[in-house]
């Protein structure tokens, strides 16, 4: 019985110890880094990507609105497709030129 009691005391002293070990220091650093990443960096990244997304979405939304009005007015699907095709070709050429620079 004595060894079990001593073992229980040893386990309790280890578990209830207030001294920092190397492992606990590393764990605290990892938790702090995780907290910083989720609370600061992730918010900045989302804000940056939201802005970029809105910037790229606005021209597409304008194209949609422009051609949606034309289709509703005319109902001519062929001319609508030709207009969209022309604008998409212009966008593709613009993207190619931007990539070269």
Curated annotation (Swiss-Prot):
Main localization of the protein described in the UniProt heading: other
Keywords for the protein's UniProt record, in alphabetical order: Endosome, Transport
GO cellular component, one term: endosome
Taxonomic superkingdom: Eukaryota
Location in or out of the cell: Endosome
Function: Component of the biogenesis of lysosome-related organelles complex-1 (BLOC-1), a complex involved in endosomal cargo sorting.
Quaternary context: Component of the biogenesis of lysosome-related organelles complex-1 (BLOC-1).
Family named by the database record: Belongs to the BLOC1S1 family.
This protein's name: Biogenesis of lysosome-related organelles complex 1 subunit BLS1
Protein's organism: Zygosaccharomyces rouxii (strain ATCC 2623 / CBS 732 / NBRC 1130 / NCYC 568 / NRRL Y-229)
Lineage: Eukaryota, Fungi, Dikarya, Ascomycota, Saccharomycotina
């Amino acid at each position: 019985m004595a060894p079990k009691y001593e073992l229980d005391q040893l386990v309790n002293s280890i578990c209830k110890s207030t001294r920092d070990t190397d492992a606990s220091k590393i764990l605290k650093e990892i938790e702090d880094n995780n907290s910083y990443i989720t609370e600061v960096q992730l918010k900045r990244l989302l804000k940056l990507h939201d802005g970029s997304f809105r910037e790229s979405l606005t021209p597409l939304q304008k194209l949609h609105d422009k051609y949606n009005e034309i289709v509703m007015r005319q109902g001519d699907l062929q001319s609508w497709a030709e207009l969209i095709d022309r604008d998409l070709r212009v966008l593709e050429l613009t993207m190619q030129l931007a990539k070269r620079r």
